[in-house]
Amino acid sequence: WTLDARLTHIGSEGYIDRGATDLKSYMFQAGYYNGNTMLKLISFGGKAKTGLTYTGATKEEMRLNGRRFHTEGMYYTSNGPHSYYYMKDGERQRATVDYYDDQTDNYLQINNQLVLSHRFNEKWTLNATGFYTYGYGYYKQYKDDAELAEYVNLDTEIQEADLIREKIMRNHLGGLNASAAYSVRKLDLAFGGSYSYYSCPHWGVLDWVDGLEGSQIGGRWYDNDVDKHDANLFARANWSVAKGLRLFADLQYRYVSYQAWGVNDNYVSEEVGMQPIDVDKQYHFFNPRAGVSYTLAERNNFYLSFAVAQKEPTRSDFTDRYMFAEANTYPSSEKLYDWELGYQYTAPRLSLGVNLYYMKYKDQLVPTGMV
């Protein structure tokens, strides 16, 4: 038996104003070893709290207010304890401001793994890992003179007001990876599979709106959920055909099911309200890889390979398409064809290598630059 544990705490005030960090983490591991069997229980995680500094500052704001200045959580008040300097009609002006003291990003994550490895004999080995990850996070923001039309549950005719909002997410990820390996003479085989399930609801609430009572604020101003099932099967072979000559091949089948529903945190218009989300897509991927390598005089290795890789769109690919695509259309999955040719020279005190490759993409998902 073996036991290991560790606790860590890191804190910093940060260089940027109100950019402090408070990071706590832990690790625990228990292991059992008995001949050809190993069993491990591993748990690690942490909690982070950091000040929001996303907005940055213009060159003029930094010149007038210092390099550490930013406007996150800032609001104007007649008796504020802080000064904000700006230019108007060529003259430097001063305003009194204060800062919301809980303008923070908060996240908790806990990872658990159960790992099994067993060697049946000289030819067969088995490896399996079960895992579960839990996460919960939110950030709080003070918004000065926010447009209230974007918060659709408010019962008011007021168009702008100061408010405090929270954006929240909770995620669950669980699954199993398993593989077996077989080795005999000049042939090495491996095969296995994995399955994972991911769930991640997102929602937002208003903690306070200037001038409104609690009953006027309403419930969640956006609320959406995501379910993702990801499964794959694979087989891999390495065959030493002759001295210095090796053939290798991989085959993978992957299935992805992705559902998302609800409303996103993007305000579209008075008619539509918040951006609707309605995604139900399934993907079937076959990813082969094959190649050959030849070692000459021990120090020279030549190789040639071909591979296919495919990837489903991300959550942001699905949500962003609403602004640019017709209804009920979805982004395509990416596909990559990769050819590689290479040479490597290895000596006790010197290693040299050259790699030529050609990658052909189909339906590649790339940033457009639009904001």
Residue ranges of model-derived segments:
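Residue-level signature of outer-membrane beta-barrel architecture
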Residues: W1, G31-N34, H118, A181-V184, ...
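Transmembrane beta-barrel wall of Gram-negative outer-membrane proteins
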Residues: W1-G11, D17-T53, N112-E122
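Transmembrane beta-strands of outer-membrane beta-barrel pores
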Residues: H9-E13, N34-N36, G45-K49, Y132-Y136, ...
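Extracellular loop and loop/strand-boundary signature of outer-membrane beta-barrel proteins
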Residues: S12-I16, L23-S25, V97-D102, N111-V115, ...
